[in-house]
Structures are given as structure tokens and as C-alpha cells.
Amino acid sequence: HGEAVSIGICLAFKLSNSLGFCCQDDVQRVENLFEKFHLPTSLVNFKNLSLSSKEMIERFRFDKKSKQNQLTFILNKGIGKSFIHNNINIDDLIQFLDKEL
């Protein structure tokens, strides 16, 4: 579970950066912290993952934060500056996930 949490936090920072909410330095600081404790920081660490970006998005719909088929993400404007974002363009999300897989 801890590995999934570390990957999720790193992906949230990467997505936040790709959407213009936080800087690359924050992404790097978060990744460096998790790497210091030998925790994974990306999906690339899981070569056997056979989900496409669209399949991942369908699984996101089952997350406890998602309501009425609307995806909800906790994104970041910087370290310690998280916020709820539930208006992500699906095409942007697919493009982001395709890059991360």
C-alpha cells in the first residue's frame, strides 16, 4: 500500500506540474524524498502493469473521492499546498498517463 501511495503522490505532483499548478522543482523534491526511502516514484517501476490510460481512468472512477462518475484529484500548488480539483479534461489526463506508462 505504501508503494501505491508514494506513486500516487508523485503522479499528483507531476500532473499538477503538467497543468501549470506547481513547479518542476517541487516535483523533483517530492520524488527525491521518496527515493531516499527506496519507494517507487512512477508507474515505470511496474513493468507488468497491463492497464492502458483509459482503463486506469475507469478504475479512478471507483476511488472514494470520485462522486457521480466525476473524477476528483488532490493536486498541488506547491509542497504543503494541496487542493481538490474535479474538472480535469479527460484528453489531457489520457495524454499525461500515456506519457507516464
Where are these regions (language model features)?
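Active-site metal-coordination segments of metallo-dependent hydrolases
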Residues: H1-E3, L19-Q24
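Short glycine/serine- and small hydrophobic-enriched flexible loop segments
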Residues: C10-S18
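C-terminal charged capping/lid subdomain of soluble metabolic enzymes
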Residues: F21-L101
